[in-house]
UniProtKB/Swiss-Prot annotation:
GO terms for biological process: aerobic respiration; pyruvate decarboxylation to acetyl-CoA. Mg(2+) binds at residues 213, 242, 244. It is an enzyme of class 1 (oxidoreductase). It comes from Schizosaccharomyces pombe (strain 972 / ATCC 24843). Thiamine diphosphate binds at residues 135-136, 182, 184, 213-215, 242, 309. InterPro entries: DH_E1, PDH_E1_Alpha_Subunit, Pyrv_DH_E1_asu_subgrp-y, THDP-binding. This is Pyruvate dehydrogenase E1 component subunit alpha, mitochondrial. Its cofactor is thiamine diphosphate; Mg(2+). The modification Phosphothreonine is found at residue 6. It is found in: Mitochondrion matrix. The modification Phosphoserine is found at residues 310, 312. The pyruvate dehydrogenase complex catalyzes the overall conversion of pyruvate to acetyl-CoA and CO(2). It contains multiple copies of three enzymatic components: pyruvate dehydrogenase (E1), dihydrolipoamide acetyltransferase (E2) and lipoamide dehydrogenase (E3). Gene3D superfamilies: 3.40.50.970.
Length: 409
């Protein structure tokens, strides 16, 4: 009965043309340098907006009109986005070095190459909006307002860490940032729950529930989509499609790889996740749509991770080194924005070099402070403290060890 089936293991080739378009699957570009602006229209003032034209192929919609490709930005916004992305990359490179020096143990998932997604989303929302994501969370933790030392300290298990050194890489939290989640796809229904709370409290805010292409096949994703549509929740389900779920390409694991269409009855938006300006514009559009209509939206950011799935994965057994080098050389999100900044006269190479030098020094100093922070006290009580944010603890708790049969305060 299976004679007519395609042989297991054969998948269509994914071809990338010179413009960065993925042939045969989708029309969105992954080029980070397609935006256009006239340098003559760029004002001297850092807070005065000027027009930028995004490429027509940075968006693709499903049951929804795509955002306008005519946007306005300021010098200050562009430099702020550049600083955010450079800081995230320096943070992740520091994590890489500390892990290899065995100062970070356990799980550690880096987002080098995906910086435009975190920076662009944060630039489009406020700190009153919420974000929940997967274990690849360091960049989002930083954009949500955590210090570098609190992130690095958490990874090294130090008291200065965001979770007092007891959560590790996958369990980092801040106000309106709900992690870092260690279970694949677990954050998707939790994101729907945050959206429910926002609607119940009548807040004009939205939630970004981010997950990867690998997690998109989890059953709980579809359950969350259904409830969000049924109840009209202001949630943006955002898939960071970095092409590989652990070591399996999307084409080998998913019968349908257009993840922005997975909601069926929920509109979707495909976005060039390597272009921070496209991410910024799409995220502004998504927030406006979900808040004003009290409805969910699916998004897919087409991006790429340079490293392996985690620090224990070299990332070269299921893809070639040439593939990674080609993307890094041609479509790097930081280099793409850097090119625009210089071409449009926002800043020159020397000014950008000074920014990079300042960020490198800041990250190095934060790492030094984190390394000097002590470990949690090696006593039994430490295992059961810092479960809740100070001031939010329940009046009573029980069952923290086998001898506690009664409630206690």
């Amino acid at each position: 009965m299976f004679r007519t089936c395609t042989k297991i293991g054969t998948v269509p080739k994914v071809l990338v043309n010179q413009k960065g378009l993925i042939d045969g699957l989708r029309r969105v570009t992954t080029d980070a340098t397609t935006s256009r602006a006239n340098p003559a229209h760029v004002p001297e003032e850092h807070d005065k907006p000027f027009p930028v034209k995004l490429d027509d192929s940075v968006f693709e919609g499903y049951k929804i009109d795509v955002p306008s490709t005519e946007i306005e930005v300021t010098k200050g916004e562009l430099l702020g986005l550049y600083e955010k992305m450079v800081t995230i990359r320096r943070l992740e490179l520091a994590c890489d070095a500390l892990y290899k020096a065995k100062k970070i143990r356990g799980f550690c998932h880096l987002s080098i190459g995906q910086e435009a997604v975190a920076a662009g989303i944060e630039g489009a929302i406020t700190l009153d909006d919420s974000i929940i994501t997967s274990y690849r969370c360091h960049g989002f933790a930083y954009t949500r307002g955590l210090s570098i030392r609190s992130i690095i300290g958490e990874l090294m298990g130090r008291q200065c860490g965001a979770s007092k050194g007891k959560g590790g890489s996958m369990h980092i939290f801040a106000k309106n940032f709900y992690g870092g989640n260690g279970i694949v796809g677990a954050q998707i229904p939790l994101g729907a729950g945050i959206g429910f709370a926002q609607k119940y409290l009548e807040k004009p805010t939205t939630t970004f529930a981010l997950y990867g292409d690998g997690a998109s096949n989890q059953g709980q994703a579809f359950e969350a989509f259904n409830m969000a549509k049924l109840w009209g929740l202001p949630v943006i389900f955002a898939c960071e499609n970095n092409k590989y779920g652990m070591g399996t390409s999307a084409e080998r694991s998913s019968a349908m790889t257009e993840f922005y269409k997975r909601g069926q009855y929920i509109p979707g938006l495909l976005v060039n996740g390597m272009d921070v300006l496209a991410v910024l514009q799409a995220s502004k559009f998504a927030k406006k749509y979900t808040v004003e209509n009290s409805q969910p939206l699916l998004m897919e950011f087409v991006t790429y991770r340079y490293g392996g799935h985690s620090m224990s994965d070299p990332g070269t057994t299921y893809r070639s080194r040439e593939e990674v080098q080609k993307v890094r050389a041609a479509r790097d999100p930081i280099e793409g924005l850097k090119k625009h900044i210089m071409e449009w006269g926002v800043a020159n190479a020397n000014e950008l070099k000074n920014i990079e030098k300042r960020i490198r020094g800041m990250v190095d100093e934060e790492v030094r402070i984190a390394e000097e922070s002590p470990f949690p006290d090696p006593i039994e009580e430490s295992l059961f403290s810092d479960v809740y944010v100070a001031g939010t603890e329940p009046a009573y708790a029980r069952g923290r060890n086998s001898l506690e049969y009664h409630q206690y305060k």
